[in-house]
């Protein structure tokens, strides 16, 4: 999946993946991670997610990473947050008191960039990637994040043969294999097919949204 795909989605405002409220799995399961106030939290492929504001409001330092400059601009503009923009290696870094977002390719992240990240939150990153990129992405998190990192991951599971992603189906077995160096605990699972007309039209019979706690 090429960067041009996502740039076009943002340019055309085809951003059905953007949620207009804070994610309930984040609110329900993040506190149990027990991260210290002031801890830095990585939010990969963050878009302009409201979840970053929620994390900041809980006292965390948020580091989002996003390919689309349009998404980054929209985040700071829509919330009236003044941002200082500088260059940080391969990334254009946008900083405010509440949230920092690096505009660029998530695969360009280095271990030193994430050395002080104690948490990771993924609601729409893993499921945005096709299989070969998911494998690279999970390996990246395992290799670049500190060993004591903890996080929350949200996925979808459905019959991929019936409809193309994104969002892609990421079965439980793939999550556990990709995060083999982590303790993976499913903390919630919900059948959401009745709220997903696109999937019903495609003949999908089950669409399960899962939330996982990741620790190591």
Curated annotation (Swiss-Prot):
PROSITE patterns, per the entry: SAM_MT_TPMT
One Pfam family named in its UniProt record: TPMT
Primary location group: cytoplasm
Any GO BP: methylation
Gene Ontology MF annotations: thiopurine S-methyltransferase activity
E.C. designation(s): 2.1.1.67
Residues that coordinate or bind S-adenosyl-L-methionine: 10, 45, 66, 123
Catalytic activity entry: S-adenosyl-L-methionine + a thiopurine = S-adenosyl-L-homocysteine + a thiopurine S-methylether
GO terms under cellular component: cytoplasm
Cellular compartment(s): Cytoplasm
Key words, A-Z: Cytoplasm, Methyltransferase, S-adenosyl-L-methionine, Transferase
NCBIfam families: PRK13255.1, TMPT_Se_Te
Similarity comment: Belongs to the class I-like SAM-binding methyltransferase superfamily. TPMT family.
Name of the featured protein: Thiopurine S-methyltransferase
Species assigned in the record: Pseudomonas entomophila (strain L48)
Gene name of the record: tpm
């Amino acid at each position: 999946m090429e960067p041009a795909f996502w740039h076009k989605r943002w340019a055309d405002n085809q951003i059905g993946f953007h949620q207009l409220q804070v994610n309930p799995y984040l609110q329900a399961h993040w506190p149990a991670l027990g991260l210290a106030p002031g801890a830095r939290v990585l939010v990969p492929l963050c878009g302009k997610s409201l979840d970053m504001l929620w994390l900041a409001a809980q006292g965390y330092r948020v580091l989002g990473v996003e390919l689309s400059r349009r998404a980054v601009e929209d985040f700071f503009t829509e919330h009236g947050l003044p941002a200082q923009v500088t260059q940080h290696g391969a990334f254009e870094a946008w900083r405010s008191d509440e949230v920092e977002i690096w505009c660029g390719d998530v695969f360009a992240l280095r271990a030193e960039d994430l050395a002080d990240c104690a948490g990771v939150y993924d609601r729409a990153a893993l499921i945005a990637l096709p299989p070969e990129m998911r494998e690279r992405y999970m390996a990246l998190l395992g290799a670049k994040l500190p060993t004591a990192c903890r996080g929350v991951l949200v996925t979808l599971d459905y019959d991929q043969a019936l409809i193309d992603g994104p969002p892609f189906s990421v079965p439980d077995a793939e999550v556990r294999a990709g995060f083999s160096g982590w303790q993976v605990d499913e903390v919630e699972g919900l059948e959401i097919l009745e709220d997903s007309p696109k999937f019903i039209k495609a003949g999908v019979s089950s669409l399960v949204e899962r939330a996982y706690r990741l620790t190591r």
